[in-house]
Amino acid sequence: MKQAVYVASPDSQQIHVWQLDSAGELTLLQTVDVPGQVQPMAISPNQRHLYVGVRPDFGIVSYHIADDGTLTAAGMAPLPGSPTHIDTDRQGRFLFSASYSFNCVSISPIDTHGVVQAPIQQLDDLPAPHSANIDPTNQILLVPCLKEDKVRLFDLSAEGQLTPHAQADITVAAGAGPRHMAFHPNHQVAYCVNELNSSVDVYQISNNGQEYHLVQSLDAMPADFTGTRWAADIHITPNGRYLYISDRTANLLGIFTVSEDGRVISLVGHHLTEAQPRGFNIDHSGNFLIASGQKSDHIEVYRIDQNTGELTTLKRYPVGKGPMWVSIRGAQNS
């Protein structure tokens, strides 16, 4: 099984395309020069397109993904603000862009060729939205707003319009700073990593996906850590057994085991990373985790122990300058 790994390096305006084999080895396939500082990335649900947010000319660059994982530029569309995080709906019809510094979220349609078009809606006055996450039902968009300690909820219509959900928001602990989210593969539980206190909140999803209730909040840091907390990313393995978060000050990944129903997580350890692990991802087999070192200009591959979730460092690889984002495309037959 071979997968493609994409690493975005904004300071050198590049995407490095790697092939990941079943032993966890990476082979460089392509280095793509991007028209701007490349930051968030998202892969289409059919795994045939890569979407990339760029600045200072705010926009989305669409790429076609070849069978071997290499990229060909297919178009560029504007955005109303600097893209901080992007996501598509689960049918690949719309792209959502959260702009932290511009306090907005926009929706852009995706045409039948998989190319993102100009936005059709913009939601303003959102206090520092750090991500835009479509729920498992493809009906609700969840937007963690870091500066108000809330996760906003919006209904998504078939036409790509967002309106406030009946449960308009989820309030998190004061000063927590909600940032990125992940969903359990059973579609019944959501997780949110909080940037400012490096904690993870666990939400039970009920009423046919319509309601979110906090069931657990857990510190992700070592007990003796006294520095400034600065969490960044969160991902769960495809089998739902292990959850990971990164913290950029401590240069580590927090490792959690997850109960069978997804509702209870337990911190079982930490693993040191490259300097400032801004982004990471887990491959589709659930065997490997790849993290970027924003200050080391390298990525590192770790093997996931299937019995404990613990990580073993395999190898580090040079990439562009200031790598921030890691996206992984599944094997051709996946």
From Swiss-Prot:
Disulfide bond entries: none
Keyword Transport: no
Biological pathway: Carbohydrate degradation; pentose phosphate pathway; D-ribulose 5-phosphate from D-glucose 6-phosphate (oxidative stage): step 2/3
Top-level lineage group: Bacteria
GO CC annotation: cytosol
Reaction(s) catalysed (UniProt annotation): 6-phospho-D-glucono-1,5-lactone + H2O = 6-phospho-D-gluconate + H(+)
GO molecular function, one term: 6-phosphogluconolactonase activity
EC number: 3.1.1.31
Residues annotated as signal peptide: none
Class of this enzyme: hydrolase
Keywords from the named record: Carbohydrate metabolism, Glucose metabolism, Hydrolase
GO biological process: glucose metabolic process; pentose-phosphate shunt, oxidative branch
Function: Catalyzes the hydrolysis of 6-phosphogluconolactone to 6-phosphogluconate.
PANTHER family the record matches: 6-PHOSPHOGLUCONOLACTONASE, 6-PHOSPHOGLUCONOLACTONASE-RELATED
Family, similarity comment: Belongs to the cycloisomerase 2 family.
Protein name stated in the entry: 6-phosphogluconolactonase
